[in-house]
């Protein structure tokens, strides 16, 4: 029976990276929220690599921060090693990556959940979703408890019918040592959702004092102060927790081939039929698929409170005895003691083409999905989806318009649009190459792009909003000024010569000189009567003038695409009745049900002729809105 004790606005199932952000966003937006997790000691757990960030993913962590999420802030509080990646490359691919203390990170997340208003944390394994007349009304747990809600958000990670593989040994688990959620999948199927399976894997953890680190190349934390969150004070970390680079060799590969018949992936009996992540293959996949003499891997610390070292790049599902033998072939790991074996895990997911852009399922009103249940991989991708699902859950209950980020606004917009429009046939990972406007979606401008949304939805304070609003105004003011300030040859030619830049023969605007790759604002700052000192402002000035031509071309492309996004496609359209559209296109359109012509043109297999014929049909029927 529904009562005050078991009724909520929002229920979040799973307290991993997606679930935490979803629950916090919902609660901060005033929704009475319940979050359930199988194990209350592993909230926000890092079951694979103990790190946040990397190319594209590091930018996502910054975007989450700009929208009012907590992943970046907690990373800053618990990190033990941090570096800026791709500093020698273009600005579009630069990103932070930090090693977190996985125990401190999890504990800090639990503290935040337990001290947030409108939020209750509770143990529970979801068994069934409760649906009436196509609408979610709550769920039932394995203990027989029924909870009622206006919205349910599923963030189930690898726990849906999770199954672990170590060689030919298999057992049911969501993660090593943790119970799976075996019943929930059948409830989703019963309600009409299509469910498939993916697999992922994790490497062995070895004891720190059994490794000879002198045989590996050290990668220390950065010398300059760094932080993910705009609201954190950047700091220089101690050098106590470096990472190391290692390599496999021909002997390693011989051992892998010797045991390959016992692999659940390659053995005579293929125990694993599902697809794994393309960009994070197992070591046996690398050896069997790529003709290389060596493969690199990294040794990464997991915590200040543990001696476990994570072997990033040596993920495997080979038998335990094979794992021991593999390590003995690598100089520095000959005496390594494995504390936790590597394993693969297979799990259920829901193809995300069954979702709307707000992450609500098309078939069940009020049911939202976020994280690995949508076929993605990665903590950052999960956290971003969770945050957006939490915001949209609250907006749905309020009766307000959904919050949908455009592909030109954020990597999170690219992520969601890719999932909804293209679906997944392998675990999805965000890459810079997936973003056609990546030059606009940078690490350095994440907060300037998104802070207004964070404030609009009540996830950033007025003080935070005003701080970033002031910064944005200052940057724009300085850029306008530098377009007006003129400098003479006598003032700048010595500076230009010292930088290997051609001299000028007549006065020019300072902005003209700043377009040169070798000249920075710092070089000319003494000539500016209203010179600024803020590092962030100087960085944005330099980027603006050097890349503005590219920015303008992208903005023109975005304007054209937004015109297509304005053309809505009715949800009740009967594609089978339309002539002159290819059969393959009709099948995809019926399945995905694009909401706009812009989205339609991003569906693989849909050609411009199909779009033109659909537009003609809709105009004839007077259905273009």
UniProtKB/Swiss-Prot annotation:
Domain of life, source organism: Bacteria
Annotated positions binding NAD(+): 276-290
Predominant location category: cytoplasm
Entry keyword set: Cytoplasm, FAD, Flavoprotein, NAD, tRNA processing
Localization in the cell: Cytoplasm
Disulfide bridges in this chain: none
Cofactor dependence: FAD
One GO MF term: flavin adenine dinucleotide binding
Entry keyword annotation includes tRNA processing: yes
InterPro entries tied to this protein: FAD/NAD-bd_sf, GIDA_C_N, MnmG, MnmG-rel, MnmG-rel_CS, MnmG_C, MnmG_C_subdom, MnmG_C_subdom_sf
Gene Ontology annotations of biological process type: tRNA methylation; tRNA wobble uridine modification
Pfam family, one: GIDA_C_1st
GO cellular component term of the entry, any: cytosol
Keyword Magnesium: no
SMART domains: GIDA_assoc_3
Annotated binding of FAD, by residue: 14-19
Entry similarity comment: Belongs to the MnmG family.
Subunit-level organization: Homodimer. Heterotetramer of two MnmE and two MnmG subunits.
PANTHER family: GLUCOSE INHIBITED DIVISION PROTEIN A, PROTEIN MTO1 HOMOLOG, MITOCHONDRIAL
Protein name: tRNA uridine 5-carboxymethylaminomethyl modification enzyme MnmG
Record organism: Petrotoga mobilis (strain DSM 10674 / SJ95)
Gene behind this protein: mnmG
């Amino acid at each position: 029976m529904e009562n005050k004790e078991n009724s909520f606005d929002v229920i979040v199932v799973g307290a991993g990276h997606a679930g935490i952000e979803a629950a916090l966003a919902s609660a901060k937006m005033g929704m009475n929220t319940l979050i359930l997790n199988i194990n209350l000691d592993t909230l926000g757990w890092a079951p694979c690599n103990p790190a946040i960030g990397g190319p594209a993913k590091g930018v996502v962590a910054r975007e989450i921060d700009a929208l009012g999420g907590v992943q970046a802030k907690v990373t800053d509080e618990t990190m033990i090693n941090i570096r800026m990646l791709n500093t020698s490359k273009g600005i579009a691919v630069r990103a932070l990556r930090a090693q977190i203390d996985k125990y401190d990170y999890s504990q800090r997340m639990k503290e935040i959940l337990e001290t947030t208003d409108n939020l209750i944390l509770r143990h529970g394994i979801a068994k069934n979703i409760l649906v009436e007349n196509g609408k979610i009304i709550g769920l039932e747990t394995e203990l027989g408890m029924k909870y009622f809600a206006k919205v349910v958000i599923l963030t189930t990670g690898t726990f849906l019918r999770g199954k672990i593989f170590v060689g030919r040994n298999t057992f049911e688990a969501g993660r090593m040592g943790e119970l799976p959620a075996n019943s929930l999948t059948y409830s989703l199927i019963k309600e009409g959702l299509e469910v498939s399976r993916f697999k992922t894997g994790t490497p062995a953890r070895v004891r720190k004092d059994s490794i000879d680190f002198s045989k590996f190349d050290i990668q220390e934390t950065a010398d300059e102060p760094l932080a993910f969150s705009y609201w954190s004070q950047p700091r220089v970390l101690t050098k106590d927790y470096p990472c190391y680079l290692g390599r496999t060799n021909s002997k390693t590969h011989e051992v892998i081939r010797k045991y390959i018949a016992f692999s659940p992936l390659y053995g005579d009996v293929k125990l694993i039929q599902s697809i794994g992540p393309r960009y994070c293959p197992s070591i046996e996949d690398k050896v069997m698929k790529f003709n290389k003499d060596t493969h690199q891997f990294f040794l990464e610390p997991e915590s200040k409170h543990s001696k476990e070292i994570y072997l990033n790049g040596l993920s495997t599902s080979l038998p335990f005895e094979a794992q021991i033998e593999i390590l003995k072939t690598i100089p520095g790991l000959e005496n390594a003691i494995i504390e936790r074996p590597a394993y693969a895990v297979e799990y259920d997911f829901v193809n995300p083409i069954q979702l709307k852009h707000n992450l609500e399922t098309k078939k069940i009103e009020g049911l939202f999905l976020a994280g690995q249940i949508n076929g993605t991989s990665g903590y950052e991708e999960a956290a971003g989806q969770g945050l957006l699902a939490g915001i949209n859950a609250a907006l749905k209950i309020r009766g307000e318009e959904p919050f949908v980020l455009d592909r030109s606004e954020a990597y999170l917009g690219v992520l969601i649009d890719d999932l909804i429009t293209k679906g997944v046939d392998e675990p999805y990972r965000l890459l810079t190459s997936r973003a056609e406007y990546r030059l606009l979606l940078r690490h350095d401008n994440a907060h300037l792009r998104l802070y207004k949304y964070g404030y609009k939805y009540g996830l950033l304070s007025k003080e935070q909003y005003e701080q970033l609003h002031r910064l944005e105004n200052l940057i724009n003011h300085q850029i306008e000024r530098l377009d007006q300030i003129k400098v003479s040859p006598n003032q700048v030619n010595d500076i230009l010569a010292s930088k290997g830049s051609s001299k000028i023969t007549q006065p020019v605007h300072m902005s003209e000189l700043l377009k040169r790759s070798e000249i920075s604002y710092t070089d000319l700052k003494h000539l500016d009567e209203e010179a600024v000192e803020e590092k962030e402002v100087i960085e944005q000035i330099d980027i603006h003038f050097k890349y503005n031509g590219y920015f303008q071309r992208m903005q023109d492309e975005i304007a054209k695409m937004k015109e297509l996004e304005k053309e809505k496609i009715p949800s009740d359209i009967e594609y089978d009745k339309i002539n002159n559209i290819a059969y393959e296109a009709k099948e995809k359109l019926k399945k995905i049900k694009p909401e706009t012509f812009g989205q339609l043109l991003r569906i693989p297999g849909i050609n411009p002729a199909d779009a033109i014929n659909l537009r003609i049909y809709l105009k004839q029927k007077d259905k273009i809105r």
